[in-house]
Structures are given as structure tokens and as C-alpha cells.
Amino acid sequence: MSSYPPRQCGLATFSSDIVNSVRLVFGDSLPIEVCALQKEENQFEYGLDVHYALTVSSIDEYRLLAEKINTRDDIGMVCIEHEFGLFEGDYGNYLLSFLLAINKPIATVFHTVLPGPNDKLKKIVKAIIDLSNKIVVLTKRSQRILISDYDCPESKLRIIPHGTHMVLWDQKDKLKNEFNYSDKTVLSTFGLISDNKNIETVLYALPEIIAKHPEVVYLVIGKTHPEVLKKEGEKYRTMLIETAKKLKIENNVFFINEFLELKQLLNYLILSDIYLFASKDPNQAVSGTFAYAMSCGCAIISTPIAHAVEALNPETGILLNEFDNSEEFQSAILKLVENKEKRLEMGRNGYAFTHETTWENIALKYAFLFAEVTESKGKLRFNFPPLKLDHIKELTTDYGILQFSKFSQPDLSSGYTLDDNARALIDMVMYYDTSSDPIALDLATIYLNFITEIQREDGRFDNYKDSNRQLTKQNELVNLEDSNGRALWSLGFLLSYQKNLPIDLVEQAQKVWDKAVVHIDGVTSPRAIAYTLKGLYYYYQVNKEMKIKTAIILLADKLLNHYHINSDDDWCWYEDYMTYANNVLPEAMLFSFLATGDLKYKKIALTTFDFLLSHYFMKGELSVISNRGWFVKGEKKSTYGEQPIEVATTIITLHLFFQVTGNEKYRNQLNLAFSWFLGNNHLNQIIYNPVNGASYDGLEDKNVNINQGAESTLCFFKAQLIMNEYKDYKKYRHLDTKNALQFEK
């Protein structure tokens, strides 16, 4: 129950974003119908989301609406978006008529919580609280006020912050050029305009700033609020325009009098250097405009509403002390106009801070709350995210794929590695086999060229090249066995698909393979052995040469020997510790069985993989080895610091073990493992970027590392390719409200 588009107000936009994000994440497994609130009957022509409309001035309609909903067995609960002024009656007490008549569970979202209530207000709000199963607020301050001033039980309360739209990082200069602001320092304010925006306070702060810095422009973005327009027309906007003229800053202040489409609005925010929030209402709890600006990477200057107090610190913006002080605004604006690096740093930090509030993450929070309120288990299913090559293409130059990104922006200074280009080659061969997309071939050619170029004369490989495409000292300081093994894996994998690939690509890979394979006898480390075994297995599928089978047996026995040396009754593993990409060891052992038919390899593969999984799957979710500290035999496993490579290799190996054994437990765990990316993790946050198809670099104890490097993105892409093979199991079922998820048939 909320105001809803085409009605133009902040709450309507908020509710539409909630509905759309839940639909995006959960599809039709969590259907939502909207009851639109309107002041007059037949006031708007609504879309298909709206099944009911409530004219808020008619108290009888509240009861009649409740009676209609009560007859619907398929409606599990009602979520009410509450704002003062939205419902009629004293402090909106007409809503109580609905709450007293409804027999469905209720979650009420308080967008504003007024402190120090009088007796009447307190009585009405307490009644809403008592008649609701759960209360949602958007800030910690609102939570404190409900507990202290309204006696709300803390157990009934849930904080779910305002959502934000995900955008790609480092688009500011590009968009400034596009909008002809390339030589400007852009200040902005947006939203439906009313005197509560207090824009005149900003205008009075600008003359001295513009005199010193004529490149400063101020964009006032948005139409006048429809309710204000009805009452007083454009009186407030006219006053602002006249004030700008009086102050002689009209050539630097631009009023964009439009209700902008979302993409255009976000573009304006991304190109803004500083966002100014000047609200004069101390009781305003939260602001969607403030949240959007921070998530778009703007440095923020704000009056001290609760949202700003909780979100801003010296690293993300400037929190003003007062609500109506032009001199304070002037000082803060000047400080950031004259310190570009500081405002860029604030923008970066704000962008990172708001990741957990992206609408996809907010959808997860609301969905889990709804499941709790309705006590429904086994009904929520994740939608399967589409494959996207965007970030892989962005990371790839004409030379190879770059190693790291700063957020979503490729970091050229990080250079290139054989490891990542080998991973990328495997991904593109897999992708081309299922899609026949010519872009995959173009990319595969780049990656194979890199592998060819970084091969030494003797057939071995270096791993590291800098941004100038020169070998680095790191190649002399670290053991390159794993990288060489990964290169052989990628070459063998490509050659196993040779029937579907251009002959020149196959011949090039064969030449590189022939030079490299002569060194496999000297491989000693378990992971290097495992990667090499994978390459040999794939090569053996199309070249049944006895020497390849002999090499597989030789290396498999080496790996088996590592197992016998390090294992005991309580530790069924190949080393006396677990580090990264652990799954590749039992995977290689199972490949050895497939190539040779020797059951001893299969037995140890099953034993060790099940041992590994026993430490990965607990309490309905996946928790892999932490990069904060390896899991040492006889010691406790570290937590957090989880990386996509470990999750993806778990998926890859579960896929193989399910194919070979047909054991349903592997498929179920496969589904559970992939749901880690989709929000089934200890933070209930997505670990992928829906905009560009990238994966984030890690899951920490309190936050997601939102850098999007090649390793993480390629691992996620390969995991998606594997999950695409399970076409009948594309959606995931939520088994309980503690996040146990699996595929829905």
C-alpha cells in the first residue's frame, strides 16, 4: 500500500523501485500486487502492477479494501508504506480503520518518525505498531525514537535502508563531455521542488564562490512537486530564479524543470562533482535523493537530517551543523571546489559505502522479511542472472586481459598475467561452443596470442607483464609452476574443442602446447600437477596418444603420493593445509580416473572431495577457505575473506562429480554454491554486478570488496556457463528464512 507511479512523489518512486527490484531478483516466486493511494477517485491511470486503488479521504474505503483483501487466500501479507500526510485523519489515523479490519500479517514501513510526540500522535503510532507484525525503519535514529518515545518492542523492528541504483564507476568525465560540462565544476540538487528543499540557502552561498571560480555551475534538477503546484503554482521556482538574478549568478545556475527518466537522472548525478542537500526539516528521516547522489559517486554536503548524520563522515562528505546557514554552505562548497582530490576521494568512499544499499540487496532484505512474516518456506526462488561479456570486454586490451579493476574501472597499471589470460581463454572457448558468438573468438584470439607471446624459448612460461607489456621482476621471485600448469590446462581445453574452432587458432595452440608439454615430468607442487592433469585430460580426449596417458598416470600417482603422505583418519587431504582453488585437486584426481579407468583415483577423488565439502557447506550456505589465513591441519578454519575463485572452482568440481557419479547431493550443493553469488551468504548481499556482469573480488566480514578484477569476473562467468547447462533448474528455492537455497525444478 503506497502512492505509486504515475503519481509523482518520492514515496511512489521508492515503492516502484521496491516492486521492480524484488521482481528482478525473485521473479514470479514473490508476486507483488500494489494498492495505490490517491487523494481523488480515478485520479491516475495505473499500470499492471496496481490491482487496487484507495481514495485516502474516504474512511469507509479503508474497511472495504481490507474486506476485499481478506477474501484473497493467495495474499500472504500486506506491506504498508507509511508517511505522515499520506493517509487522511488526525496524523493519518484513517489507516487504523484498515488495520483493524484486515486479517493478514502486516509489515509497516515508517519513512518518518517524529520525536517527542504529543499524546494523540503517540496513541495513533502505537496503535499502528501494535497492529503490525513487523515495523521497518530506514535509519538507526528512527529505530531509537520508536523504542524510546513510542514503546515499540525492539524485537518487532527491522532497519532496511533506502535503496540505490547501481552505476558503473569512473563515468564522470565521459558524461561531462556528453552534456557539455567538461570545463565546469558541477554542483547539483535534485528532486521534486518545494520550499522544503531550501535551495535559496545554497543560492546565497554562491556569489563569492562563483566570483573566485567562474567555472562553477549549479544544476537544480526536477519539476515542482505536484501538490505544491496545485496550491501555489510556480511561486517558489519563480522566487529562486529571481534570487539568482538578484545575486547576479543566473548564468551559473540552471533549472532543469523536468521529471527525468531514471537513466538521465543518474547521468546528471554521475557528472556532478558535489551534491548539495539543503533540507530545512530536522524531522526528515531519510532522503532518496541523498542516497542516489552518494551511490553515484558525488561528494556530499548536507544539512544534518538523520540519514546524513548516519551516512556522512569526513571520508564521504561534509555534514553541516545547521539547517539554514548560507555561510556554512559557502565554506563547505569552497573547500571542495578548491580540492579536487578530496572531493574525488569522498565520491569514491561514498560509492563504496552505498553498495550494500543497491536495490538488489534491498530486495533481498525485504524478501527475507516477508518470508519471516508469512512463515513461508520453500517459495522464494532467485532469478538466474543473464550472461554479460561487458566487463570482460572492458578489461581486455588488444594485448590481453588486465589483472585488476578499481571498482568497475580497469586498472592499466596492474598489468597482465598468464593466469588470467589462461582463464579467459577457457571461458571464451566454452562460451563460443554454446553461443557461436564471434566476439568470443575475437577475445580468445587475443588471449591465445598473449599466452604464445609470454612463452619462453624453452617452452616454459613467464606469468607477469606490466602495463608497458614488459616482463617484471616478479617472474624471477615467485614459483611459476601453478601458472605453467594453468597455461597447459587452457591449451588442452582449447584443443579438445578443435572441431568447432578456426584451424589457425587450433594450429597456434598446438605449437604452444608442443613446446610446453615436454616439461611436465618436472612438476612437483600439488596444484601445478592438478592443472597440468586437467590439460592432459582434455588433450587426451582428441589425441589418444599412449605418451599422454602415461603422463597422466605419472602425475596422478604423484598427486596420490601427496595424499598418502599428508592424510590420516581425520585429515583426508593432499597437503597439511588448505589454501586457494582447493577443488582442483580432487577434480584432477577424478579426471585421472576418467582417462585411465583406474578406480584408486576415483576412490581418493571422492574421499577428498567429500572431506573438502564437509568444511565448505554448513548451516545452509557455502563458506569457503578464507584468504585471511589458510586452513591448517589440526587448527580451526578462518572465516570471512571469501573469494569468488574458491566458490567458482567448487561449482566447477561439483558439476564434474555430479556428471560422473549422478549423485544428487552434488547437484544440490552445486545449486547452493552458486547462490553464494546471488545473496545466499552471511551478509545477504549480491557478489556480482548486474550492470556489467562482473563479479566482486571478495566477501569480508562486514562488507563486499567491490573491486572487479579479472580473476573474480572470469570465475563467475565460467560458473554461469556451467549453471546454464542446468536449464530445468534455473531458479533457486529458498528453503528457510536462514538462507538455505537450492534450485527449483
Write out the residue ranges for each language-model feature.
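A short, well-ordered alpha-helix in the C-terminal region of glycosyltransferases
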Residues: 335, 342-356
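Conserved donor-binding/catalytic core segment of Leloir-type glycosyltransferases
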Residues: 181-197, 203-206, 219-221
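Carbohydrate-associated surface elements
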Residues: 141, 163, 224
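Nucleotide-activated donor-binding/catalytic signature segment of Leloir-type glycosyltransferases, i.e.
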Residues: 232-259
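Short hydrophobic beta-strand element within catalytic cores of glycosyltransferases
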Residues: 299-302
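Glycan-recognition and catalytic cores of secretory/periplasmic carbohydrate-active enzymes
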Residues: 217, 245, 360, 368, ...
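Acidic anion/phosphate-binding donor-loop and adjacent secondary structure
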Residues: 119-120, 147-148, 163-178
